């Protein structure tokens, strides 16, 4: 009976340890995903800013061409 009791405690202990390790890895993976999403969001906003700058320059150039044509 004592042998079965020790075996049962050993199995439960090992199960809890493996469960703890799995939870720790799961949390780490979630944190990594959150960091990746934040980095992707920042890159996307930088790309948008760059695109808006280009659009502003093009509109400004077209506007100045339009003014020149009106003067002639």
From Swiss-Prot:
It comes from Ranoidea aurea (Green and golden bell frog). Residues 1-22 form the signal peptide. Its main location: secreted. It is found in: Secreted; Target cell membrane. The modification Leucine amide is found at residue 65. It comes from the Eukaryota. Amphipathic alpha-helical antimicrobial peptide with weak to moderate activity against Gram-positive bacteria, and no activity against Gram-negative bacteria. Probably acts by disturbing membrane functions with its amphipathic structure. Strongly inhibits the formation of NO by neuronal nitric oxide synthase (nNOS) at micromolar concentrations. Acts by a non-competitive mechanism, probably by binding to calcium/calmodulin and as a consequence blocking calmodulin attachment to nNOS. Transmembrane segments: none annotated. Residues 23-49, 69-72 form a propeptide. Expressed by the skin dorsal glands. Residues 38-47 have a biased composition (Basic and acidic residues). GO terms for cellular component: extracellular region; membrane; other organism cell membrane. The keyword Secreted applies. One of its GO terms (biological process) is innate immune response. Keywords: Amidation, Amphibian defense peptide, Antibiotic, Antimicrobial, Cleavage on pair of basic residues, Immunity, Innate immunity, Membrane, Secreted, Signal, Target cell membrane, Target membrane. InterPro entries: Frog_antimicrobial_propeptide, FSAP. Amidation is essential for antibacterial activity against Gram-positive bacteria. Belongs to the frog skin active peptide (FSAP) family. Aurein subfamily. Residues 27-47 are annotated as: Disordered. This is Aurein-2.2.
